[in-house]
Amino acid sequence: KKNNVYVIGHKNPDTDSICSAISYAYLKNELSQKQEEGAKYIPTRAGHINEETQYVLKYFEQEAPLYVNDIRPQVTDIEIRKTAGIEAGLSLKKAWDIMRGARIVSLPILEDEKLAGIITVSDIAYSDMDVYDNMILSKAGTSYKNIVETIDGEMIVGDLDGEFEEGHVLIAAANPDMMEGYIEPQDMVILGNRYESQLCAIEMDAQCIVVCMGATVSKTIRKMAKEHGCRIIVSPYDTYTVARLINHSMPVRYFMTTDNLITFHTTDYVDDIQEIMAKRRFRDFPITDNQGNYVGMISRRNLLDLERKKLILVD
């Protein structure tokens, strides 16, 4: 599209104006092919076609030139960054890995190709600051698949289907007698290789226990866990690392911005969006097409590389 050149006549075009645009665009395209310029010349018109011109076009079996009522640069004339969208259930860790790898600060969340929200580096940083809510993992409806992937673990009892929907996340740092006082049914307990602690958590109806340091889990504990409907995840990391990582398994939908999103359409004029972009603190702005499908992202920097439409005026 950057190589498009529009050949256009005056407003309220007559037959001469229309035929001039068609013939000159044809000539330029022929010369462009021979000279290997790569430019594409498109005949256009700045008004509606009268009856005389319609008759001439029909007689010579020519299509009417493209109607153009405004040649101001549009969003489609900007280099739109094709940032791939992610699913709302993707973990914060995976979203961060994508942003770090692509060197970007925001990602669009899509549902059926439509924009559902935006997750930014700031949102991920905010998720790390809420350290006093030990139920946030269940409030976010975190999937067990995300949990296992985030802590590089293995589910050795139970399956990956389902979500951690209720309960606290606790670390079994005390002896079993004290554990009985703070573990509640449906909790998730992070612990080590102590048999007594594992057994206590299961008997207290924990929903899941996370065994750290890749410790071996005995057959007795596995059997007890199956009988109580308790999942067992084994992670190679130490307790501190698991405790830090596990919150990064939460889905991005819990932290993404969904309200007051500033989006632009591919047909919007650059003049109209510049002022909006200047007043908003957002780094990136999502672009959608006429069907509302997500196309990509632009930033203020993209406006610096704007290439205006090229015209040839004829009559």
Located regions from the model:
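Short, ordered loop/turn segments at secondary-structure junctions
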Residues: 10-12, 46-49, 112-114, 121-124, ...
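Long, charge-dense
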Residues: 133-134, 222, 227-257
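Short, glycine/polar-rich helix-capping loops at beta-to-alpha or helix-loop-helix junctions
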Residues: 51-53, 216-223
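Bateman/CBS regulatory modules and CBS-like beta-alpha motifs in cytosolic regions of diverse proteins
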Residues: 66-98, 110, 142-195, 200, ...
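Short glycine/serine/threonine-rich phosphate/pyrophosphate-binding segments
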Residues: 15-21, 198-200, 218-219
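Short hydrophobic alpha-helical runs that function as membrane-insertion/retention elements
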Residues: 42, 65-67, 107-108, 189-191, ...
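Short beta->alpha transition motifs characteristic of CBS
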Residues: 104, 108, 114-130, 237, ...
